[in-house]
Amino acid sequence: MKKIATLLACALALPLAAHAQKVCSAADATAAQKAVDKIVSWQNLEKAWHDYRHCDKDTVDDGFTDALMRLMVGWKNLDAISAAMARDAEYKKWVHKHVLSPAAKDDREDVYALAKKSCPAKQDAFCAELAEVVKPGKPGAAPAAASGDTLFEPLKPIPAPNTK
């Protein structure tokens, strides 16, 4: 019985391992970029993710983030993204990764405001979670607006070596 359970566990884990090790060929990267450029709906986004998540790096990563944030700021048909994230924890993690991406920083405050003030009926849990993820002031989230915010800390003088 233990052998059957072990074999079953291995058989179930094999497809996951194969996905994790899939290499993004040059052809895959080109196809992924084309697919990402055509994303106009939550369904397109989810399909592109399923087809090309193994290519989610470099320009494809930025393209995915741009497409996701464009849809988020458009704030339409949220039931589709909410349902997709509810049924697939890996997809949900991927969405959260992209909304926290540095490439998404310019849109995070808008998404936060939409989630807090314009939540569609029956999407309260989705909006609350999304607002918490992109909440300004949270590490990785949109910075809290304040006067004098700078991207870098000012340089501090280096003490002169003691020559005595």
Regions found by a protein language model. Give the residues of each.
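Sec-dependent N-terminal signal peptides
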Residues: I4-L14
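Eukaryotic intrinsically disordered, low-complexity regulatory tails and linkers enriched
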Residues: D149-K164
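Intrinsically disordered, low-complexity segments enriched in glycine/proline and serine/threonine
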Residues: A5-T6, E132, K156-P159
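Sec/Tat signal peptide C-region and signal peptidase I cleavage site
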Residues: L14-A20
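Extended alpha-helical scaffolding segments
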Residues: L45-E46, H50, H54-A145
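Extended hydrophobic/Leu-rich segments
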Residues: C10, C24, I39, Y91-V95, ...
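N-terminal secretory signal peptides
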Residues: Q21-D62
